[in-house]
């Protein structure tokens, strides 16, 4: 029991130590310099996301398996729809698509006061939709986002359930947002499944 508990403590200390300095620097840089905030955000996405899984694997025996062989069969650019199971899903995609520019559709609350995450989402221009936006407003956000990601050769990622599942089962698929993003980006669609 002590060994299991101690490994959790060590993992938390490592994770906290890893994210604290970049998070604080990005909070300071965001209002002052977009260029520096972009550099810090890129570091968080490209360096810290893979390290997160290394720490979890080392101390908690958490393993990530992705079908990397399937990437060679995909077109150069596409959009992704996926189920949404946990708070690690975004980091999973960052790890799997290491080196590619990916952008998420998220609720705007994540763009405010969430350490490490908020400045990255705002600086990299992810699609932050107000929770209480009218349907037409939400569709407008998605249309602009789809066009922007296609022009910048970025991979837009949408969780059409709209939120994380509470029990591991796939939730209701909201197709209107998917259709608008697909139409505005003009990109082929890749369906991903997250499990575990």
Segments predicted by a language model, with ranges:
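Membrane-anchoring hydrophobic helices of lipid-metabolizing enzymes
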Residues: 1-78, 91-92
